[in-house]
Amino acid sequence: MQILKWQIIMIYRIGVIGQFNLTFELAWKALQEILKMHGADGAATGSPREILQLGYKLSFVDDAAVWLLMLKKRNTSVHIYNEQEVDEMILLIRDSFIPAFVGLEKTLR
């Protein structure tokens, strides 16, 4: 029974990471669309990194370092192999990434 409970908890935790990946994809693509609507140079063809940097430059995102860390973590999250890495990712999502998503949502309204 204890092993089953641990497995269920891990499934939920890995699901949180999967939802972060999806949310990040939607966020940077929404930012790209907003930048295109504002006529920002490079918005139409930019990579996620370029879009995030441009969004920071034009004050759509508050903290470029957090967004670039999100990009890095999104790219490496498929290679999380142990519980400590899952713990670290969950804490980053809770403490840094969710507030950044909320900030972008407020800015885009």
Model-predicted regions and their roles:
Residues M1-R109:
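Solvent-exposed interaction patches of small proteins and small membrane subunits
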